[in-house]
Amino acid sequence: MDQSANKLALVEPSNFNFNTETFDTNVFQNDVQFNKLKIFEEFDNFISTLDKNKISFNILKSPKNSPDSIYPNNWVVTFEDGTYDLFSMHSPNRRIERSNSNINFLNKNYSLKCDLTKYEAKNIFLEGTGSLVLDRINKTAYMAESNRSNIRLASKWSQLRGYDLVHFKSYIDKKPTYHSNVLMFITDKFAGICFDSISDSKYLLSNIEKTHEILYLSIEQVKNFSGNALLAVSYTHLRAHETGYN
């Protein structure tokens, strides 16, 4: 089992825009004017960086009317055993991202193991590795509770996948943190966490310090998306850290 990703899934930002359906739950979201040319320039630069570091990736098409489609990890998660899981999305326009072409791509490369999409009809949500920060080596899932990260559904998923669930409450600007992966990340050796946003930080620290060296993140750093990080390995087996784009 490895914590690093050996291939990335990227979605071209052709529909990236302000999402009115997620604004109420995302404290980081601001209604600003989007510069499409700048967005594609950054996307192309990122691809060049991946190529330079010999990191493999696939580029998926963005379905129409899907402003957040560049975050596919919220609706689908793949695993080392060649399986994938589909997750329950809070926003209707995020469910569009499960397009036929994207599902066909997944089915050609993986086998579906767990489908949680039926819980959308019950208003019960769990949004992939946005909700769950996975320690794949030690089989532990860390989750900040929110209306987009349901404890019961997370427990059901954890039991199916054989993970231990560690859940906690997190607040930024007096609002629940909508996704766990904005405030913490995990690599094979260390974990970056914003303890200042967590109510019972001692509980989380006692769990994660058993397996990882801790990198402390400030709320200001989290607001600048230092918590969105991923450990990637190149096809020459050299490792690289790239901060998440949000």
Label the model's feature ranges.
Residues 1-61:
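N-terminal leader/transition segments
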Residues 2, 69-73, 77-78, 126-136, ...:
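Structural signature of eukaryotic scaffold interfaces centered on beta-propeller domains
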Residues 12, 88, 136, 143-147, ...:
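Short, structured patches in soluble enzyme cores that scaffold and shape functional sites
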Residues 53-93:
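Long, hydrophobic/aromatic-enriched structural stretches that serve as scaffold segments
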Residues 56-61, 113-119, 166-169, 215-217:
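General small-molecule cofactor/ligand-binding pocket signal
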Residues 91-150:
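Hydrophobic alpha-helical segments and helix pairs
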Residues 153, 166-229:
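Redox- and metal-dependent alpha/beta enzyme cores, enriched for Fe-S-associated oxidoreductases
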Residues 236-243:
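Conserved small/polar residues in nucleotide/adenosyl-binding loops
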